[in-house]
Amino acid sequence: MHHNDKQRLPFAGTSHGETVTCSKDLNSDLFDAVLGGLGQFGVIVRARIALEPAPTRNKWARLIYTDFATFSADQEKLIAPRSDGSFAFSYLEGAAYVNHSLAAGLKNAGGFFSDADVATIVARAAARNATSVYVIEATLNYDNATAASVDEVLDSVLKELRFEEGLAFVHDASYVEFLDRVHGEEMALEKIGLWHVPHPWLNVLVPGSRIADFDRGVFGGILQGTDIAGPLVIYPLNKSKWDDSMSAVTPAEDVFYAVSLLFSSVANDLKKLEAQNQKILRFCDLAGIGYKEYLAHYTVRGDWVRHFGGKWDRFVQLKDKYDPKKLLSPGQDIFN
């Protein structure tokens, strides 16, 4: 969900058996339709994407929080553009660890934290009587031209944040090492038998005004006392970075959060985790949290209408134009 604003030029295969070149200036309605269109209008068979030189190294930081309000405020500060349009960090994500699974979760974070680090974090959480711990993960890219100043720049950013005192962990890594970080986490999970198992993931986009309610009800409620295998990812996004003419739908607020509960099923608990996911969604529904599921799957037309909201009528019109026989992606039960 991290992308730049450089123009993409998809080549989409439609149900008419055509390959259509499209962009913001050419066949723009198809261009917008296929982006987040769940395969309903065409299949992107080729894309032209502008590239730029990659950095060589980065400062890779993980910052520890025991208070959600402080954590989310710092995250939102970091995604706000500065006066010159730049951002404090090159990359930003976040994670939550519920207390019951805190030590195990930190140890499975791709080897980033040492055993001593884990012990220190667990002790601080206990001292704060924290039911959850939150981590901001961020990088600051640099190359030979900026190597002499990168530490000073990083320190100036960290001074603006309110993480737990003394609990900023920084690695100096090659850019390739950072990009390959998930592979390290995969290897760690594979060693303990948690990779080649079912993964009942739940991905939702939560309005910024309701993320504290989500935290209290889910991280501080439903997931408390459970054994969690897999990362709980949470970070804010600027709606201004999303083109609202695309089929993709997001909450109608300037800032919303991507929350990815990336569970791994162990000990034959798949059904339990699926039921837990439904419990989380029911909580959001009852609390009136206007979330949107990412990669949603509904079986009732009314749920799809609710999901697309104000984009539904346009979605139907484009379906009639580009796939009138309803041949593409019938398994999603949107039109079938």
Regions of interest found by a model, annotated:
Residues 206-211, 257-258, 263-286:
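Extended C-terminal subregions enriched in glycine
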Residues 1:
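Glycine-rich N-terminal segment of FAD-binding domains in flavoprotein oxidoreductases
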Residues 204, 209-259:
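C-terminal structural cap/anchor segments
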Residues 74-82, 156-164, 213-226, 279-289:
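Generic non-transmembrane alpha-helical segments
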Residues 121-138, 201, 265-271, 320-335:
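Extended, charge-rich low-complexity interaction segments
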Residues 182-194, 200, 285-336:
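Activity-critical C-terminal alpha-helical subdomain
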Residues 8-204, 208:
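C-terminal substrate-binding/cap subdomain adjacent to the FAD-binding core in PCMH-type
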